[in-house]
């Protein structure tokens, strides 16, 4: 019942287009050593410098399309979350609003599954790292490193939102998404290596 209520409220954001401000904070931590881990750390430093890891807030005006700014990115809907993907859900009423907290079950997403993110449980409600995004980022490093595989495990994903009890309009939403990735790559100089990020 809580999940169904959340889905309706989340989907109303893209239908009613109330205006939204998206603030994103992205970080990753590289575990491992050697040349490949060193390259991964250099990529992270470059992403920090060009603003990819801490992009400027995005403000979408009332009435404008929210499809690109609000999860799920570039879809006309926001959530198709199923109860089977959830480990717990709670709802507390306070001051005319419902505060909903959803904790998702852990999910392993292979590099091949990341090619079809909407077929994953996380991809039904949050933006996950997609294979085409990884491929695009790796193009600039193709002279240095070849990516063979990238497995992601999403663990601890939490959604906390406040929904107006009368209008069922979402007032705020906070998505916390944690992905642990294992990257298998090779570099001409050092050979094969595995890095956890």
Show where each model-derived region lies:
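Subset-of-secretome marker
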Residues: 1-197
């Amino acid at each position: 019942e809580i999940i169904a209520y959340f889905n309706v409220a989340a989907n109303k954001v893209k239908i009613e287009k109330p205006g939204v401000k998206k603030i994103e904070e992205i970080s990753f931590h590289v575990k491992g050593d050697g040349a490949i881990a060193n390259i991964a750390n250099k990529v992270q430093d470059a992403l920090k410098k060009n603003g990819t890891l801490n992009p400027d807030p995005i403000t979408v005006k009332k009435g404008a399309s929210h499809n690109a700014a609000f999860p799920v990115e570039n879809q006309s809907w926001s959530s198709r979350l199923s109860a089977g993907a959830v480990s717990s859900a709670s709802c507390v009423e306070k001051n005319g609003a419902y505060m909903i907290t959803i904790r998702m079950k852990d999910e392993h997403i292979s590099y091949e599954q990341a090619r079809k993110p909407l077929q994953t449980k996380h991809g039904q409600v949050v933006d996950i790292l997609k294979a085409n995004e990884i491929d695009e980022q790796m193009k600039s490093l193709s002279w240095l490193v070849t990516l063979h595989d990238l497995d992601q495990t999403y663990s601890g994903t939490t959604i906390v939102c406040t929904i107006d009890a009368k209008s069922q309009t979402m007032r705020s939403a906070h998505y916390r998404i944690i992905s642990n990735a294992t990257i298998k790559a090779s570099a001409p100089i050092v050979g094969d290596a595995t890095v956890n990020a």
